[in-house]
Amino acid sequence: SLRMVLKYFNKTVSKKDIVRKIGGLKRYGVRVIDLADFAKKLGFDVYCYSNNKKLSKGKADIRKPNKPDILKFLKNGLPVIVAVRTYVIFNEGLSNEGHIIVIVGHKNKEFIFNDPFDGKQKNINEDKLIKALKENSLDSSAYLLVIKPNIK
């Protein structure tokens, strides 16, 4: 997911390098908070939201998932990385399984997202996406990550 967004900003980093720099894969993949730290080290401005004070370790703004936050970033041309509950999005997987996707647009009450799993672009009803975010937000170090080139 981060690799997709870095590529959007013309920054190429291999999947292997990202995994190595964030300390390897955890039991359930990567933590959004670790991706945020890595993006900061690359010189990006980072917006990171969490709904779990303990897991975020003080590295994210604590707030509940909501549609206006996502739309604000999209309006400014920034892709939005989100951690969602897998079974809500895809109607499959374990009830406690999370997945990270990249939201790239919004049209006709649907969000458009890129799925790092298969690289395909997909659409999802906005209410379903917010439900998937809310159901995963308490189990995630962070549920939303936006990076922006630091222009000085």
Predicted segment positions?
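Noncatalytic regulatory segments and standalone regulatory/sensor domains
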Residues: 48, 75, 85, 90-95, ...
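Short linear motifs in intrinsically disordered
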Residues: 26-28, 101-105
